[in-house]
Amino acid sequence: MRFTNIVTSFIKNGDRILILKRSDKVKSMKCLWAGVSGIIEKNDTSPLARAKTEILEETGINEEKIELLKANKQIKIEATQYKNHEWNIFPFLFKTENPEIKLNWENSEFQWIKPNEIKNYETVPE
């Protein structure tokens, strides 16, 4: 089975978390809501380093404006859109205070939601 290593970060601001709507220009999971995500590259020093890079690229929030709250265990999920493929997801939770969000081309919208509101959004697979 093939696999892809991915980071997914959720950013907390008070009692809300940031979710992003993936644009129709990305390769997979188009127009679905998710945390800040990206593929871990071969030259990345760690999943945490990649998570911080993705946060900057996708939201404009730099490393000085975020604080790591939790790094969870790796999660393995079968990729439904590819045969014999697995996503290895490295999840992170960060906090920030009232950041200005500047989306890049990978996402078309963002929302600050209470965690229990996630059920109201069409999200990437769990």
Range-by-range predicted roles:
Residues 1-18:
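Conserved N-terminal beta-strand and adjoining loop/helix that marks the start
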Residues 11-12, 19, 94, 112:
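Conserved hydrophobic "DFG−1" position in protein kinase catalytic cores
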